[in-house]
């Protein structure tokens, strides 16, 4: 039976020496943050009575390697980190690990002749009682790039040998488009062979907060607005330093990992990084529709659409639709808005890219004081809306909302927009919310404005939520106490 895992909660291991991490010397005392559901999924595969072929994939930096290393830490296993090298070099490296794991073939050969004999020999790896032959191949797409026949070869070996043995073979990769097209699609030789599929997502805000455990809830939310749920980014911040100090020292300073991160990833993922940089800067500056993006980047709409599709494939961009959009309407793509999904990319293209020249000469304090600090809360407004929507999803799972929500998201039309909306199946029951990431309390006019907006949504039952960074006015608190349809949620409550 195919086991597809769609994680609701996620996090990753917590290592401040991440950049120098050595897979062969895993520290068992290292703190590991979250990923509870993902680990349980992998453990269920491991303890299954049947052979397992598991595909783990997700964007770069999301924590795949750390999850798999943590999962395998107390088990006999082979963890092969595929190098970007020639086929022969890759095969030699894999042979070495197989022989070190006890393959009897080591007595007769110094290296496997080909991938067929190497993969087939997994069956002969010795195991202890109660364990299974666990082989993890990280960055599997690197191997396929050197030998395109590998998926067909594994398919044949799986069908005729591996699927009847005590094997758990894990194929892991960061090239999401490649994994989905070349391994999981119907055209792939491996289609239908995977017994488990784990698409790893960025961690939710409540797990990301564990990277800065001593921060106030407001600073945890601000950190998430800057770095998002990508563990490699979060681990760069020093939890004993303030948010502004971390921004200056860990993002704005030349030579740091985050300073050059977007440039590195764009060159890793795309052949034309300059074009993609231009598109992302246009979206970050407010261009959210295809024609607007095409005009700002001086691209033909058809060409711009292709670039945008590629950015969506690597989870840097998304096309967002109103929460009540019908499937047919969404497929026609008439009202969709392009948004940068990665919080750090949004921060980088909004603040770093336009100021690179001055940062290159070391004007860190000036750029922060005049270009970033005055606009930081404005930039955090959209990520804060996502935090509030995720809080609603979690509360929905906890059954604490007035009704069971079927859809949760943002809503807009040509005249107005609502930050977060939850609807039931019939869309007759609504929960609408306003999210304010600002330094003054929310007062009654904000509520009245929200109530007026709901007139565009024809529902028979309406509930109102107000999310505040800095609390609520006394008058609004009194009103909410007397009206059960109004709920006030502070930033502190978001982190409870």
Where are these regions (language model features)?
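Phosphate-binding site recognition
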Residues: 1-365
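A cross-kingdom feature that marks ATP-driven nucleic-acid transaction machinery
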Residues: 8, 19, 335-496
